Amino acid sequence: CINLTTGSHVAVKIHKDDGNVSEVIRKEINMLKAIRTLDPDKNNIVNFMEDFMFNNLSCLAFEMLDRSLWDLMEERRWIPLNLNEIRPVTHQLMIAFDVIKSIGIIHTDLKPDNIMLVNHNDQPFKIKLIDFGLARRVSEVSIGTIMQPSSFRAPEVTLGLPLTEAVDMWGVGCVMAFLYFEEFTQDLQDAVKTYPAKKSDIEYRDRMAFLSLLMSILDLNPETRLTPRDCLNNPFLNIFNAVRQTFNLVLTLELPTANITSNHHEDSFPSKIT
């Protein structure tokens, strides 16, 4: 649609109100208004512009975005992303979830369909988190509440245990695994064994850093599962650390007298996460 006041293109979500969804719509609008205060552009969250009625239908206007990560994977014929593509996506998701966690909100519906590319041609892998229709305040979530798509559902949801913002982190881990392995699998050990052999020591170390982070996010215990802030400080996502480590390694490899050895003789999943 086109905003006649500004001339800009917007995306409009139209709710078909059958008399039973008015409360759901009201909750979604209230959630969107709360999230709108968080500086959506800075924090990688879709910009909610306004809500209005048209022909007795409730409409929500959002900024126009490109396509979802699911659409992108489908266009690629399900060829997995490489780590240099997964890294910025994960980093931006952590920023988004860190800020919504700060105001006590759980998204509850993370999946590749709800991660939108902003403009993939001009800003490759610049993403925004969308669809807060099922978002809840953590203080209002009761034990036994069923949430999240089944393939991305945290174990504490399935087991009927107390729920916190940690359920969203499980969802992020599932998305990371999906982007890297082409399909989501909870058996990471088997997935790693079937993954192509390392191409170089640099690639191998990066892969091990990614897998270590992924396993810590997919921690079965929500109390010890990494938080978004933990992940932002992780070497795999800490851009400055990653650049510095790679630069130092390249310099070492280029020295004429360099004698580089590796303790890793085959690709194996980290046996211990610290």
Name what the model sees in each region.
Residues 39-50:
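Conserved HxN/HPN-centered segment at the entrance to the catalytic loop
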Residues 54-63, 70-71:
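A conserved loop-to-beta-strand element in the N-lobe of protein kinase catalytic cores
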Residues 224-261:
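Regulatory extensions flanking the kinase catalytic core
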Residues 1-16:
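Glycine-rich ATP phosphate-binding loop
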Residues 101-119:
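Catalytic-loop of the protein kinase fold
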Residues 14-41:
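Conserved N-lobe beta3->alphaC-helix segment of eukaryotic protein kinase catalytic domains
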Residues 89-90:
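Activation segment signature within eukaryotic-like protein kinase domains
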Residues 183-213:
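C-terminal lobe substrate-recognition/regulatory segment of protein kinase catalytic domains
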